[in-house]
């Protein structure tokens, strides 16, 4: 994947402003609410019975932070995302058996959450750069499935 200097700047400058715990928790909660079938991967998280329960679930928040911390690793390694996610791809495929479509769904929710938090600062150029990034990340996470 080729990243322009502008894309790298847009991604990195916005990422430096986010609260990984807050955005991660909201992103994972959004995935579980909007796409309820994804909850089967997280049944051990306890109460996922309603949007309020999901949003307030400390395990959802903690795992969302973990997910976005890994996403931050991709941002630090934009030119080597596939290798950055090689072990996570193996884990999600071989051990956790996550449907690889869920990676793209999570990425799309992340873009929405970022847009919600950053308002007018999240320009169409930011949207395009982050959409490209989540597509590359989801493809890298799904790599082991191919």
UniProtKB/Swiss-Prot annotation:
Residues 2-146 form the Globin domain. GO terms for biological process: hydrogen peroxide catabolic process. The keyword Transferase does not apply. Keywords: Heme, Iron, Metal-binding, Oxygen transport, Transport. One of its GO terms (cellular component) is haptoglobin-hemoglobin complex. Red blood cells. Heme b binds at residues 63, 92. GO terms for molecular function: haptoglobin binding; heme binding; metal ion binding; organic acid binding; oxygen binding; oxygen carrier activity; peroxidase activity. Gene3D superfamilies: Globins. Pfam families: Globin. Coiled coil: none annotated. The keyword Chloroplast does not apply. Belongs to the globin family. The major hemoglobin component (HbIII) is a tetramer of two alpha-2 chains and two beta-1 chains. Involved in oxygen transport from the lung to the various peripheral tissues. This is Hemoglobin subunit beta-1. The gene is HBB1.
């Amino acid at each position: 994947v080729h990243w322009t200097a502008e894309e790298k700047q847009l991604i990195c400058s916005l990422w430096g402003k986010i609260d990984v715990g807050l955005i991660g928790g909201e992103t994972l909660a959004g995935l579980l609410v909007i796409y309820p079938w994804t909850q089967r991967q997280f049944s051990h998280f306890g109460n996922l019975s309603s949007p309020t329960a999901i949003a307030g679930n400390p395990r959802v928040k903690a795992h969302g932070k973990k997910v976005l911390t890994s996403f931050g690793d991709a941002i630090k390694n934009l030119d080597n995302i596939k290798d950055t996610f090689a072990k996570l791809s193996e884990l999600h495929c071989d051990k956790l058996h996550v449907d690889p479509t869920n990676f793209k769904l999570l990425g799309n929710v992340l873009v929405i959450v970022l847009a919600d938090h950053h308002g007018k600062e999240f320009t169409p150029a930011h949207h395009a750069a982050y959409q490209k990034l989540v597509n590359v990340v989801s493809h890298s996470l799904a790599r082991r499935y191919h």
